[in-house]
From Swiss-Prot:
Pfam families: DHO_dh. Keywords: Cytoplasm, Flavoprotein, FMN, NAD, Oxidoreductase, Pyrimidine biosynthesis. FMN binds at S21, K45, A46, N99, N127, K165, I191, G217, G243, G244, G265, T266. It comes from Geobacillus thermodenitrificans (strain NG80-2). The active site is at C130. This is Dihydroorotate dehydrogenase B (NAD(+)), catalytic subunit. Belongs to the dihydroorotate dehydrogenase family. Type 1 subfamily. GO terms for cellular component: cytoplasm.
Amino acid sequence: MNRLAVELPGLSLKNPIMPASGCFGFGREYAQFYDLSVLGAIMIKATTKEPRFGNSTPRVAETPSGMLNAIGLQNPGLDKVLAEELPWLEQFDVPIIANIAGSTMEEYVEVAAAISKAPNVHALELNISCPNVKKGGIAFGTVPEVAAELTRLVKEVSAVPVYVKLSPNVTDIVAMAKAIEQAGADGLTMINTLVGMRIDVKTGRPILANGTGGLSGPAVKPIAVRMIYEVSQAVSIPIIGMGGVQTAEDVLEFFYAGASAVAVGTANFIDPFVCPTIINELPVLLDELGIRHISECTGRSWKTGAHAVHCRS
């Protein structure tokens, strides 16, 4: 028995560990270090219809317990991803989760319809943190009704299951998750980065050229765990958790909160071997805790009588 194997909509994972979108490119750099086939899945970099060159530099800044980024969805565009990146990944025995993004609902639909037909794409990850240019730049993922409509439209054209990536920058992430589930999403991934800023005390100006950026790394882990804990009790679709994961212990914490698989993001920049290291350490940790199979851990914190905290300071 493979005690790390996980079955999710569209995904038969040999283990629940995968690199998060935006922290692994299309895998070419990391393939120099290890065989990507050891991974449970690969979440590729966000793909848009046309190539994007990203924001002006500087667009990355360190923080005491993580990093800020304002890359701006730099990517080679749909045609090149279909012609070069996805075919290159076919050499590895690993399912691909294609992260898609857009400025309009029409762009999302066009990208989803095309990329979901690639032979090694087993699921889509819908990045709803993008600004909606037809609605004054408000992100798709901040209004439940808009996120639900986008989910419905993508589901109608996708040839594979659709997972929606939730933004933590919302008033009520549980309401958002419920709306997206009702719209037909097959699963959720969470959390995306939190909006943050650093200022250079010598110049008095923001360090990032964009002003603000997405905060990731260990600093966001407690927020991710709390949000997964709350959302997993409110929906019936599976959650792929992410946000500050660095160790096998972190993975188990996310499972206990309610995740069914886990993506590793910023830690890949610190240690390119972090994913295979976690995969190797998980069985040892399960042995220490007397756990037969990783799936037994999903939601253990609330299934065993723990209570959600409703009063927040």
